[in-house]
Amino acid sequence: MPGGYDIDHFIPWSFVMNDELWNLMPMDSSLNSSKSNRLPQWDPFFRKFAGNQYILYKLIQEKPEIHKLYEACWRDNLHSIWAGQELYRPRNTKEEFDNILAKNMRPVYDSARRQGYEVWMR
């Protein structure tokens, strides 16, 4: 990405083994290197992450050209049933979106912690 940003996985790729949109975020390249294969602290990072995800969701819903890109991406990179049926359905409020995202991501995050993934202390 221009401007020194990478696309990072909130929950490390080595744990989720996918590139689904619900787990991706733009991140400063140097911070991405520092985070490496660790989990971000749930608080405060999840709130910021969910906010960025909601911005993406609104763009998908409101901009036909972005919705078209989302549709192409969805075919290859959106295999979680909950994401297609709940997260990216039309007309979610921000609160609904955040709750759906947290409800589905927190168990995956906690499972990664139990499997020994370290938390990135930033």
Predicted feature residues:
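A structural signal for short secondary-structure junctions
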Residues: 19-20, 61-82
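Short, flexible coil/linker elements and helix-boundary hinge sites characteristic
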Residues: 1, 63-64, 116
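C-terminal, charged low-complexity interaction regions
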Residues: 74-122
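Active-site loop ensemble at the mouth of alpha/beta enzyme cores that anchors a bound cofactor
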Residues: 32
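Histidine-centered nuclease catalytic patch
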Residues: 1-26, 35-47
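Long, His/Glu/Asp-enriched segments that create or flank divalent metal/ion-associated functional microenvironments
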Residues: 29
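Polybasic, low-complexity binding patches
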Residues: 35-67
